[in-house]
Amino acid sequence: MERKFMSLQPSISVSEMEPNGTFSNNNSRNCTIENFKREFFPIVYLIIFFWGVLGNGLSIYVFLQPYKKSTSVNVFMLNLAISDLLFISTLPFRADYYLRGSNWIFGDLACRIMSYSLYVNMYSSIYFLTVLSVVRFLAMVHPFRLLHVTSIRSAWILCGIIWILIMASSIMLLDSGSEQNGSVTSCLELNLYKIAKLQTMNYIALVVGCLLPFFTLSICYLLIIRVLLKVEVPESGLRVSHRKALTTIIITLIIFFLCFLPYHTLRTVHLTTWKVGLCKDRLHKALVITLALAAANACFNPLLYYFAGENFKDRLKSALRKGHPQKAKTKCVFPVSVWLRKETRV
């Protein structure tokens, strides 16, 4: 009886962290944007899925190819691509959920994994990007003094620590699964009585998962600019290490401004100003859009690999050559076949 009563309460989506039920004030105004979600989320999620699988799948293939020189940068980028690919694999299920009018058909366990995967990907991506930028900065400023910090072994250890911390800190999201509301099975939702806990979780995630990495990136960017202003740049341009460090941090900051900061900002505003019966449709829709942008970071990260990766372009060309060996063979076989034809005619 108690569970049935709680299922009738307004709910808040775990992944969007936004009201997901229908609330009514004195004027009986409908406070839901289910139609907007149904039209927006499926197509956006499927686009992200297509490009994300293409970009990250190819990137992982390139990173795993044997190469004469491997660096810690490639280790961080490989882990980032794996994180993105794991998250992207859940997007078709999310698209199906909203296409069915927020009706979940894939079972309780899969429902619990949805929210968990979103936040594990988001914050592991943030920390992989941050650590990658810091390592690039240290390699530029102290290329020989900090070799132990930028070694491949240290990179794998640091990646393992990031995975463990992010997965452990997000474990509480596995508490909430699917819930039957009449003929509809809801997913990605928490009951309203957990709003205080949700606000606390949001503040912790905002500070530790967004603001701290953002300030770290900003400081690295300013220090790199300071170093470049002191260094005499030759006519050939910046040194390779300087250029790659600057490119890495600039692309990472762009991803932060586009994907992570808008979502964390609007999520915080939405949670702190939300009240039962108070409709804020524009803020609600804006939050939905920023959530999609946060998910789209999985599509933007391959650009970082291409423009700032260590030997990524050379590795990509080498991998593509391996995928098309027939061209090299036909150049050698064709003259032989012509000669054989001439011999048979004689």
Curated annotation (Swiss-Prot):
Keywords: Cell membrane, Disulfide bond, G-protein coupled receptor, Glycoprotein, Membrane, Receptor, Transducer, Transmembrane, Transmembrane helix
Cysteine-cysteine disulfides: C111-C187
UniProt keyword Lipid metabolism present: no
Classification via InterPro entries: CLT2_recept, Cyst_leuk_rcpt, GPCR_Rhodpsn, GPCR_Rhodpsn_7TM
Cytoplasmic topological intervals: 64-72, 145-153, 226-245, 308-346
GO CC, alphabetical: plasma membrane
Domain of life: Eukaryota
Ranges annotated as spanning the membrane: 43-63, 73-93, 124-144, 154-174, 205-225, 246-266, 287-307
GO MF annotation terms: cysteinyl leukotriene receptor activity; G protein-coupled peptide receptor activity; leukotriene receptor activity
Main location: membrane
Pfam families reported in the protein's UniProt record: 7tm_1
Extracellular side: 1-42, 94-123, 175-204, 267-286
Topological relation to the membrane, as annotated: Multi-pass membrane protein
GO BP terms in the entry: immune response; neuropeptide signaling pathway
Entry keyword Transmembrane helix: yes
Residues the record marks as carrying a glycan: N20, N26, N30, N181
Localisation per UniProt entry: Cell membrane
Tissue expression pattern: Widely expressed, with highest levels in the heart, placenta, spleen, peripheral blood leukocytes and adrenal gland. In lung, expressed in the interstitial macrophages, and slightly in smooth muscle cells.
Protein family (similarity comment): Belongs to the G-protein coupled receptor 1 family.
Purpose: Receptor for cysteinyl leukotrienes. The response is mediated via a G-protein that activates a phosphatidylinositol-calcium second messenger system. Stimulation by BAY u9773, a partial agonist, induces specific contractions of pulmonary veins and might also have an indirect role in the relaxation of the pulmonary vascular endothelium. The rank order of affinities for the leukotrienes is LTC4 = LTD4 >> LTE4.
Protein name as annotated: Cysteinyl leukotriene receptor 2
